[in-house]
């Protein structure tokens, strides 16, 4: 059935291996550019919390979390990769517009599990109602640490971020240059070609696909714009010659470049990719982070 296909996609974006057939997408709304709040910094932060589905996780979600069927899903993106051993449900609180406070039923880092990707945590539970009492804040209330992959381990405790509403489309929240040693994927996602000279990972607030449920292709590749910045300060916009990290159902894409000029920013135009709720992306822009700056 159509609704099963749609919601299995959402789970598939957050759980490796579940596939989707079709998806019914809503129409693109008025144009606006969503500027990611990411800047190179050593301080921990929450980059986004995205209300993905409301009371709609499918029955198969019980394989991940007993009782997840018909619950809500909120992916939260962190500034640094997370230490999975410190990840607990009680680390999180979700506040609703009406003043309710909820603790997730369960949390998971899957399926974004390649090196450098483990910064998206999916919260599953009852987090209000999209119409009458939507979730508005995600807060870290326990000792949740980064994994120290870049710099020393950092504590996210005390941080919070506003929840993107259910009917808003997904935006870019992070772009980072990937060290060449990490270009190869450990999961089923596709790799950038060996002739790549630079690879930029972009992270979306939630899972994104085409409106028909398929992965992005050459058309979408040509819509990505990477701004390169030369040593003299001049800039040039280029298009990636290939896309990587496709087919693994997470919220990351790899932009494969044939230039070694440092990438400065990434943008993507509105109305081409949809989230699990069928909402189209807005115009979106994010500055590129070099992991050596973190």
Model regions and ranges:
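Bacterial N-terminal signal peptides that target proteins for export
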Residues: 2-11
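Bacterial N-terminal signal peptides
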Residues: 10-20
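Non-catalytic beta-sheet/beta-sandwich ligand-binding modules that flank or precede catalytic cores
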Residues: 25-294
